[in-house]
Amino acid sequence: MTKTAAVIGGGPAGLMAAEMLAKAGVSVTVYDAKPSLGRKFLMAGKSGLNITKDEGLEALLEAYGAHSEEMRPMVSMFDSSKVKGWVRSLDQPIFIGSSRRVFPEAMKASPLLRAWFARLDELGVICLARWKFKDFNGGGLEFDTPDGPQTVQTDVTVLALGG
């Protein structure tokens, strides 16, 4: 029987969690309170969408200062080369600027986000906007939705609530 996952939050962390879960064979639904998903990602793209730096692991970790060792396991699993590879896997060419920052050639977020949504759709991920998470209730998740209150049962819940 296929496991189900609810990802609450449609920003980059939630979308990445949805992608990884779907690739692992989990049936995923992403819920977001806003009218559309990826809104902060689009805002970040207004300044060119610096996606990573073209640096090795140790140089990347230096950016985390006193927290570099705490971040090492995560950054090691998804380092600069993997971030660049992920963007390229969405058929989005990249370039490396003089500061070693890496950008999509389009210099904006919308083409990358559209390609990401297309991939999620191909993986069977369902994305629901205007579903505001309210509470956990008896093993279910309570949402306020455009059609009124809804309760969702799921095997796994990922909270990707952003900041």
Predicted regions mapped to residue ranges:
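Predominantly flavin-linked oxidoreductase catalytic cores and closely associated redox partners
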Residues: 110-111, 116-163
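Short phosphate-binding/catalytic loops that engage adenosine nucleotides
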Residues: 26, 92, 125
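N-terminal Rossmann-like FAD-binding beta1-loop-alpha1 element of flavoenzymes
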Residues: 3-30
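Glycine-rich active-site loop/strand segments that organize a redox cofactor
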Residues: 46-96
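Glycine-rich FAD pyrophosphate-binding loop
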Residues: 22-46
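Fold-independent oxyanion-binding glycine-rich loops
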Residues: 10-11, 32-34, 45-46, 53-54, ...
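Helix-loop-beta segment of a Rossmann-like dinucleotide-binding subdomain
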Residues: 66-71, 88-114, 154-156, 160-162
